[in-house]
Each structure stands twice: as C-alpha cells, then as structure tokens.
C-alpha cells in the first residue's frame, strides 16, 4: 500500500512539474527564452562546481580554480566553442566538451525561438492588430471605393500642416490596404499637381501619415485597437452591401460615447430620424448624418435643368480649387454692413455670416415658420446664407444691407485657402437694373424629361424636377424595374404623367424602336441612371453605352447634339470620367466623388454640413445660372467682377461667378465655369453667357427668375 502511495505521489509530482512547464512554455517567446537562460545558468554553475571539486585545470599549473574563475571559463565555452583548442588536460577537456555541446544546443534553441518569435511578431503586424497610440488623427472606419478620394482630399487639406495622420480600420488585410493606397495615391505627385493647377508656384508641403489596421468596425475590441477617443474626427464608410445602414448604426452606437465628431453617410433618411430620436436627450450631439441620396438627387435634378451645374457643385465641394471656410472677423469690420463687406472682399466670395448672437425674431416670418417646422437647420446654428433675404428691417436709404456685422460674428467665405481675406473698401455706385421678367405671376412651365435607367434615387429626382415645372409636365422612363414602381410613383408622388416603358435592356439593336417610340428632340432634358444591383464597372459601362446610343441618335437627325442638349449621366468610378468627357455630354455626376468630397470637408469643419444642407436640400438658398442679359444691357463694354457683383447684389443676390458658354465643352477651362473671380478682374460677357448666383429660389417672387 505504501509503495502504491509513493508511486502515486511520484506520478502526481511529475504531472505537476509537467503541467507547470507546459503553462510557462505556452506563454510564448519570452517564457521560452527565460527557461533557456535558466538552463544555461544551471549548466554553467553545475559544471563549474565539478571543475572546482575535481580540481581540474586547463593546463599543468598547480592549484585549483576558484568558483568564479570556473564559472567564467564555462561561460566562455558555452558562447565560444573555439576555446576548446587551448585545453591541455583530458579531464578538463571532457568537462569543457560537455559544457560546449550543451551550450551549442541551448544557443541553437535560442536562435530558433528568437526567429520564431520575430516571425510571429511580423505575422501579428501583418494582421494589423497592434494598437494605435497616436492622438489627434482622422479615423476612417470601413472601406469602399470612395476611400481613395477621401484620403486624397484630406492629404490636400493637410498639406500646410505638420504631423497630420489618418488611421483606417476595416475588415481588409492591412498589407493589402497599404499597398492599394500607395498604388492609387502618390502624395508627392498629388500635392505637386494640386498647387500647379492652383497658381503654378512651388509650395512647401507636408505629407500625411497613413496607418491601417484590420478589424470589424462593429466589434468593440477591434475598435479599441485604434482608440477612437483620441481621434479628431471619425468617418464611417458604408459598404455597398449595407443598404439598410445596419452596420453604420451599430458602429455609431458603439462609438457615440467616445467620439468627438462622427461623420457618416446615411442611405435611408428614416434611419436618421430614428437615430435623432434615440439621442435626443444627449447634450452634445456629435454626429453628422450625410443624406447622400437626397443631396445627389437634388444635384442631378438641378443639372438636368441647368447644364453645367454639376461642375459648379463639384468645385464647391472638393479641395481642388476654392473651398468654403469660416473666418473670424477682424476689428476693422465690426459695424460694417454685410453688403459693404461682400462687395469689397477682393479675393473671396462672402456667402453669408455665422452670427454669435442671433435674435430669431429679426428673421422674416417665413424663415421663423420653417425653423418651427424643423427646416433650415443652419439657421438653428446661427448660420445665415445670403442675409439679404432673411432679415426684417434691413433696408436703409432704400438699399438692402443684409445685416450689420457684430463682434464675435464669423464670415462664411468661398476662397482658395484658409487665410484672412483681402478687403479694399471704396464707394461704387451702380444704377439699379430692372430685372427682366415677362409676368408678375408665377407660371410654372410644362416640360418633358426622359430618364434612362433606374435606381432608388429616381423618386427623389422626379420630386425635385417637379418643384419648378408644372404638374402636367411629362417624365418618361425607359428602364428595367419592378412592375409596382410606376404605380408607386403615381400614388406616392402624385404625378400622373410619369410613365415607364419597360425595356429590359437598351442595346444598340433596339435604337430604332427607341427612336420611333420616343422623339429625343422633344425632350428638354435626358437623365441616365445606373442600376443599383449592378457592380460599379458594369453600371458605368451600361450608362456610357446608353449615352453613346443617345449621341448617335441625336447626331443622325443633324438637328442637335450632346453639346446643345441637357444630358446628365450618373457614373460611379472617377476613373471613367475621361471616357465620359470625350462624348461632350453636358453634365456628369460622379456619385462617390461628390459624397467623398463632402465627407472630407466635414471631417475638417462640421459646420459646413449646414451650408451644404441648405445649398443642396432645396430649402433656403440655392445656386442658379441666369443669362447675363437678365442683369446687364450693354454688352459692348467690359465690367469688373465687383461691378457685376454690385448689380447682382441690388437684386438681393450674391454673385458666385460666371459661365463662358463658348468654353462650355473645354475641360482645360473647367467647361467655362469661373468661380470666385478677383473683384478687380475685367470681364466681357456675351448675351448667352451665364451669371452664377446664390439666392432664395424657393420664394414666390424669385421663382419667375428661375423659370
């Protein structure tokens, strides 16, 4: 019985030692190195005692080695096997040989462990699971085709600032993300081309550091890798599969307590209302929802009514030329009127003002009413675009002054950089020109629009189209869609003249049918949309094929061409831009580019959201192009841009620029669009040229100008 007990105890002790050894070794490279170090020390010490006790020496000298000397000698044998050749006595040689062999084994194992440890470290680095310990960076969560445009815009925005950083977290492989970014974005070349297009001069610029990490944007542990609480702003990108905004909403819920500022695209506006309701009791609302479908629909509809509008929208939204900035007011401007500042700002367009203190009672009744209905969110934040139209009691000596500038106010500027604008104050008297309008009654025109293709934005596009045309206007659709769509359009939008001709595919072989069924010459505008269910390249290819078909059919009749017809094509990949430009189509909407430009700008200045929302939501100020002969009568002379701005200001409107219609198909001249012209520049206009203005298009008194 005692033998069995001793045997059991030995087995138990053996298992304990084995378990302890396995536990420590399983902890990784550091614990293995520690065990090898202990083994080496024990080997050196044990055999040092052997040398001392057996009185062994490497030579014939008398006297035994001290323990310290023996340890040193054995340590040298462990790290340097070549020392054996100096040993003379066989007893010492045998001990040294054993120590050396054990040392070779230990160091061999150590090298193997270190190599494996480094390999594992590199694997972990490749996995992108190491923590980000940076601060004040822009965090991008998710990955979709817009990310390259967003990064490019941020790189340009950061060009004048040191140590700017972008951190990206997505489910993609870290190395693949880095390789793709480096392949698509050459920062040095990007900045060089940007400043060459701006002023042709060389500038000292700084590149932005980009860090990629792999993980799920809805996993708390993965989010902690990038420390979202240290980010200046967070951009959430929705995937093409996330049509219901599910992952976006989950990510917002995970981040809302940590993030300083979140910018995200919301595809379904009902989700925005839901999120607003969930967070209504929170004091700090730090989330900006971009209603991409609404804004893109508005831009598409406007482009179909105003050829060239997409060029204007793109220039306003991206960093390539001028941008919108909020600028603090200098002491010299306090007490001056908005009109004075607007007309005498030489290098910038003053779009509006952000009031430090805004008495809502000073606003016109229509704006107070719209604010009560939850519209014009910008005014809720004291952001006033085109003050000429919004304030009561702003007429002094028969002149609309907009408002008086007070201490703490900020100007909303459209200019080339974020520097302080240049002012040159001087009196400029311009005889007020009577706007040419055929009638005082607002009579909306009847029009015909042809839409080729279908996606979920078609409802909003049609709704926007009918805002400035009569209800008996016709919209014809040629597309493959569900049978319920036409009924849905009529029932929900209330437009009886919306009709769909369901053609499964508009191939070249069907052009005779289309030409016979639809007289293209009878349409004022044509819109080409991509199908949601198709891949990006397939969508663009189908849309471009349709455009070529339209081009061929129009030119066959020799009555008109793409240059003269208002044709808007929606494309998704910016790389297809150059192909579209070859067709001389009047407008193209690059959906992803527009949204990525908006996201990039909002990551730098969140108040721009309220500016863009007013410009592209159809509520408040809008951008329009009017024929120059609506403002001036004498086309034999030149006008400075300041003179033109003064003439336009007399109509309670802000002049943004002009469009030279002779340049409308010239890419190098931005298709004739000239924004933020120096106030001293002289311009000679033709009757068919357009003045680009910012005004309240929704007001009844202004609608006659639009039509």
Regions from the PLM with identified roles:
Residues 1-707:
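Cytosolic regulatory regions of ion transport systems
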